[in-house]
Amino acid sequence: MLMFQKPKGTRDFLPEEMKKRKVIEKKLRKVFDSYNFSEINTPTFESFELLSKKTGDEIRTQLFVFKDHGNREMGLRPELTSSVARFYINEFKNTPKPVKLYYFTNCFRYENPQAGRYREFWQMGSELIGSKKPIADAEVINMAIDGLKEINMDFEINIGHLGVLKGVFEKYDLSDDEGTEIRRLIDKEDMEGLKTVLSRIESEKNIEISKKVFEVLELKGGREVISKLKEKLAEFESSVEALENLDSILEFVPHEYIINFGIARGLDYYTGMVFEIYGKREGARQVCGGGRYDNLIELFEGEPSPAVGFAYGFDRIMLNIDDFQVEEEAIFVVPVKSSDMLLNECFKIAKTLRDAGKSVELDLMGRKLNKALNYANNKGIKKVLIVGENDISEGKVALKNMETGEQSLIELNDILTI
């Protein structure tokens, strides 16, 4: 048995997996950049006070918490929204609005590892701060969708609005705690628990709320759902306003979606539109979640600032995309035999190619030619430059295609074209 193993809930990524992750990361970055979002990063750890501000001390058991040498309580970040809110207040509060930021980084949660759920995981997400216009919500939704289209992932997006149920709760004079309890049961899809809680509230308040709640939850579909629900909730003014806000947002979303008011999102700071995106992989279906949170900056003692954003679960995206091979683009440069003169020529050729931005590997083991070619073949390197005395004296080098076995002489002046 090996003495040291990786910590529970973490992973080592082999070179082939890292290449695939980099390909997907690059494509997602391309989409974020196309919307002119600017990349930032924040510390890996923050004060525990900051990390627990949204949820309270009960989150402690879900985090990696420690004290520094100054006896200050710190925690590894479980997500980026709190850190970005702090960063915004520290650095961007006087910047012209909207402020459009994105990030790609690792996060940490102390939870039981299972399929698609790790103690160290990667998130890629965005925050758009400063605009409360419906088109800002649509911008974020469209960017999340475009990213997954860019990587050719099959997915389904569900969009809802917390204001619809909130309007029902207000009409029946439910407390904030009662509304939060109902929303958390909806988020967990615990319908039996929901029925029990609603029944208890009905008995205590002598009201009939269950029917309206389930009417909202059960009505799903395209944009026509909004008009149907407006009829059913005509006397619920706040709910109708939320439906009209959602309709204004969807005016700018040209992609297919499912309206679903059963999206409650586990975090309590969401205030309006919410959405979730699902892949096809069982056990790792939800790959993205987001929405509007207009009170978050204020919660962290900043000026009231409307905000909307989302985060991809990058590891879940990797589980949901079809396996693919990354083409090996490196060029292997090897002398036909061991010789200081030929090694020097190989070094100069490698430097010329590297200076032009190409990936080049030199034979560093002093192998005989056949073994060097076997090494290149095992690594999946498709192009090998073989440097021989006679060829180099004529300003040429041999190019071997490892896929076809074909070999030809090319001019040294032409090596940048291979």
UniProtKB/Swiss-Prot annotation:
Q: Which GO terms describe its molecular function?
A: ATP binding; histidine-tRNA ligase activity
Q: Which reaction does it catalyse?
A: tRNA(His) + L-histidine + ATP = L-histidyl-tRNA(His) + AMP + diphosphate + H(+)
- Enzyme Commission numbers on file: 6.1.1.21
User: Which GO BP terms apply?
Assistant: histidyl-tRNA aminoacylation; L-histidine biosynthetic process
Q: What GO CC terms are in its UniProt record?
A: cytoplasm
Which keywords does this Swiss-Prot/TrEMBL entry list? Aminoacyl-tRNA synthetase, ATP-binding, Cytoplasm, Ligase, Nucleotide-binding, Protein biosynthesis
> Which cellular compartments is it found in?
Cytoplasm
Family annotation (InterPro entries): aa-tRNA-synth_II (IPR006195), aa-tRNA-synth_II/BPL/LPL (IPR045864), Anticodon-bd (IPR004154), Anticodon-bd_dom_sf (IPR036621), His-tRNA-ligase (IPR015807), HisRS-like_core (IPR041715), HisRS/HisZ (IPR004516), HisRS_anticodon (IPR033656)
The family line of this record is:
Belongs to the class-II aminoacyl-tRNA synthetase family.
Against NCBIfam families, the record matches this protein to:
hisS (TIGR00442), hisZ_biosyn_reg (TIGR00443)
Provide the protein name. Histidine--tRNA ligase
What's the source species for this entry? Methanococcus maripaludis (strain C5 / ATCC BAA-1333)
